[in-house]
Amino acid sequence: MKNVLIFTFALIAFGCSPEAKKPSIDEAVTKNVLDHHLQTFQQNDLDGVMEDYTEESILITPDRTYKGLAEIRENFVGAYQALPTNGTTMTVTKSVVVRDVAYIVWKAVTPTLEFKYATDTFIIVDGKIISQTYAGDVVPVSATQTPTE
């Protein structure tokens, strides 16, 4: 009986810890992070873009899933090679922010590639992108081809 009482007390004392702090959801913060991300991305500001992520962040693309700061940084190094600031036109055609979710649709034309349709979805918690997905229809631009407007 004594062992049962000790076990019960231990469960009550240690098993009933206070509820873990829930992340705050602030739509204004979500919008601010999205705005910062878009601005720094379009300027090819790698350090600025990386400020939006944490070591726990995940970026999912059709080709690969990037986990943590080093892998996500590697993705953006490649993205900046595909989307150089010189000669690239990028247009966000839709932007939606609801609670902790940001969603964008965009298109871009570079000297060598056309992003006919691209989309990203972001989950933002406590001012950081914790999850992001990207998908797009990307085709090469030939010397004789006029990019789609």
Over which residues does each language-model region extend?
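Sec-dependent N-terminal signal peptides
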Residues: V4-A13
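Hydrophobic pocket/interface hotspot
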Residues: H37, V49-M50, S57, G68, ...
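Short beta-strand edge/turn micro-motifs at domain boundaries
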Residues: Y117-T146
